[in-house]
């Protein structure tokens, strides 16, 4: 494990004992509305770009415990076409036990071998890049994702655009930086999403109403075309 990946592992170890993280993880209304919102956008993107979900081959970078993998299966993806990478060993064990039918890559995603079998229609990341504070490593990972992508495929991106003043282990990534990371892309389409978490956690059932105002959204979904 290199220095940068070790930093990420250490960050997540600290989060396990962070009272704010523990408290927010159980916020039903915010988690429900935020997840439903982004899954709707993913669905619209995928149905617009691909004719048959059953033929799409996808790789998720930093899949965690597999919440998104369940979503892609519900959308019509076949298990044999769903692939996942995870750096953290405890989360990887959950993936291995929960998804014995999919192909898994443990450790640093930059170490995934590039070959004909390891090329994908979609390479997906969700809140991975904001945990990487080193610019060089972000560029390296973006280049690896690009190299794993088939021509005509997309990098599907979900992450927050603004810094979290209460968490120095993360750094927001705006449109300009995404464009620089994937400067080989012929076209990037952005969608603003996710009501600002400090607001969303407080307003509960009013999330959909306040989320009508784009200036209150803090995250970006990006379709990054190859």
PLM regions: where:
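N-terminal, positively charged/glycine-rich alpha-helical extensions of SAM-dependent methyltransferases
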Residues: 1-25
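Conserved alpha-helix/loop element of class I SAM-dependent methyltransferases that forms part
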Residues: 35-54, 71
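Class I SAM-dependent methyltransferase SAM/SAH-binding core
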Residues: 59, 65-112
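A short acidic, Gly/Pro-enriched loop at the edge of an enzyme's catalytic core
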Residues: 114-123
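A short SAM/SAH-binding and catalytic strip from SAM-dependent methyltransferases
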Residues: 122-136
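A short glycine-rich, Lys/Arg-flanked "PGG" loop and its adjoining helix->strand segment in the class I
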Residues: 139-151
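Conserved beta-strand signature within the Rossmann-like core of class I S-adenosyl-L-methionine
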Residues: 152-159
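Short alpha-helix
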Residues: 170-193
């Amino acid at each position: 494990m290199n220095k940068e990946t070790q930093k990420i592992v250490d960050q997540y170890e600290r989060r396990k004992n962070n009272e704010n993280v523990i408290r927010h993880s159980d916020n039903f209304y915010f988690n429900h509305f935020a997840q439903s919102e982004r899954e709707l956008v993913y669905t619209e993107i995928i149905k617009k770009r691909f004719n048959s979900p059953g033929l799409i081959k996808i790789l998720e970078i930093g899949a965690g415990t597999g919440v998104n993998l369940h979503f892609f299966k519900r959308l019509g993806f076949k298990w044999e076409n769903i692939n996942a990478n995870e750096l953290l060993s405890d989360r990887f064990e959950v993936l291995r036990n929960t998804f014995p039918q999919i192909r898994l890559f443990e450790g640093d995603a930059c170490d995934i071998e590039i070959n004909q079998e390891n090329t994908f229609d979609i390479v997906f990341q969700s809140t991975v890049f904001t945990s990487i504070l080193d610019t060089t490593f972000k560029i390296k990972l973006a280049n690896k994702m690009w190299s794993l992508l088939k021509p005509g495929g997309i990098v599907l991106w979900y992450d927050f655009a603004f810094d979290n003043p209460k968490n120095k282990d993360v750094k927001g990534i705006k449109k300009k930086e995404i464009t620089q990371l994937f400067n080989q892309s012929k076209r990037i389409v952005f969608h603003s999403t996710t009501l600002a978490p400090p607001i969303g956690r407080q307003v509960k059932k009013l999330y959909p109403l306040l989320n009508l105002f784009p200036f209150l959204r803090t995250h970006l979904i990006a379709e990054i075309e190859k």
